[in-house]
Structures are given as structure tokens and as C-alpha cells.
Amino acid sequence: MAAYLLAVAILFCIQGWPSGTVQGEVRPFMEVYQRSVCQPRETLVSILEEYPDKISKIFRPSCVAVLRCGGCCSDESLTCTSVGERTVELQVMQVTPKTLSSKIKVMKFREHTACECRPRSGSRVNIGKHKRSPEEGEREPSSPLTPGSL
């Protein structure tokens, strides 16, 4: 077993880590950015959270992988929101503890097909110019980010 683990470790060193980059290699900005934007991405969802009325059953697996919106938006007042959905049907094993019976069951899950950054519920987003009262005064323009300012 130890020889197997050593061989796997050596293979990772030669071929690179599973993420696609060699350990210690810097991932390019555009790859980092593209992977972080608001988009449908594989997410593990608990079956019992999707079907709370089935609490008396046991499911295997207990969670399933579906596409759900996730990622970063350009502004704190925005959140990554689904704007398109479809229904997918997945096979899972349902176990009934009382009778110790099990069967393969097809269950439906929502999967997101398109995402957008939209205002958070309850957030006040100003569209256009906001007129300030004399008590508020003028606001100083924010300074742009420079490479050394972070």
C-alpha cells in the first residue's frame, strides 16, 4: 500500500495535480476570472432539502450533483441569480427503513441553465444620479485601484 501511495505522489509530481496546474504554478488571471464569474456550476444538493416531505426515507446517494447558479458579481449589492431553469430526472436508491426495502426511483430536480447578477432583495440600488441634500455634502470620487494599493 505504501508503494502505491508513493507511486501516486510521484505521478502527480510528474504529470501535475488534478486541478490542471502543477503544484506551485501560478494560475493565469483570465482562468481565475472565468472560473469565478456568475454562471451555472455543478453543486451538490441534499435530496432531503429538496424533498423535505420524504424525511421517513433514506436515499443513496444522499445528495446529487446538479447545475446551480454560483459565482461572483461585480458589486456587493448584486447576487448571482437563476434566469433559466430546466427539470432533470435522476435515478437514486430509496430505502424504506420500516420494511428494509429498497428500490431505484427517478426523482426530478431543478437545474439552472442561465444566471445573471441581479440586485439583492431588500438592497437599495440607485439607477442614475442621486441628488444629495445640502446636509449630505459632496462625495469625493473614489481613487482607482493601482497594483500597489491592495
Swiss-Prot record:
Disulfide bonds join 38-80, 69-115, 73-117. Keywords: Disulfide bond, Growth factor, Pyrrolidone carboxylic acid, Secreted, Signal, Toxin. It comes from the Eukaryota. Snake venom VEGFs that may contribute to venom dispersion and prey subjugation by inducing vascular permeability and hypotension. This protein induces an increase in capillary permeability after intradermal injection, as well as a drastic hypotensive effect after intravenous injection. The hypotension is mediated by nitric oxide (NO), which is produced by VEGF-activated endothelium NO synthase. Also induces angiogenesis in vitro, probably through VEGF receptor (KDR/VEGFR-2) signaling. It holds the Pfam family PDGF. Residues 119-150 are annotated as: Disordered. Residues 1-24 form the signal peptide. This is Snake venom vascular endothelial growth factor toxin barietin. GO terms for biological process: induction of positive chemotaxis; positive regulation of angiogenesis; positive regulation of endothelial cell proliferation; positive regulation of mast cell chemotaxis; response to hypoxia; sprouting angiogenesis; vascular endothelial growth factor receptor signaling pathway; vascular endothelial growth factor signaling pathway. Homodimer; disulfide-linked. Interacts with high affinity with VEGF receptor-2 (KDR), and with a lower affinity with VEGF receptor-1 (FLT1). Does not bind VEGF receptor-3 (FLT4) and neuropilin-1 (NRP1). Belongs to the PDGF/VEGF growth factor family. Snake venom VEGF subfamily. Expressed by the venom gland. It is found in: Secreted. Residues 122-150 form a propeptide. PROSITE patterns: PDGF_1, PDGF_2. The modification Pyrrolidone carboxylic acid (Glu) is found at residue 25. One of its GO terms (molecular function) is growth factor activity. GO terms for cellular component: extracellular space; membrane.
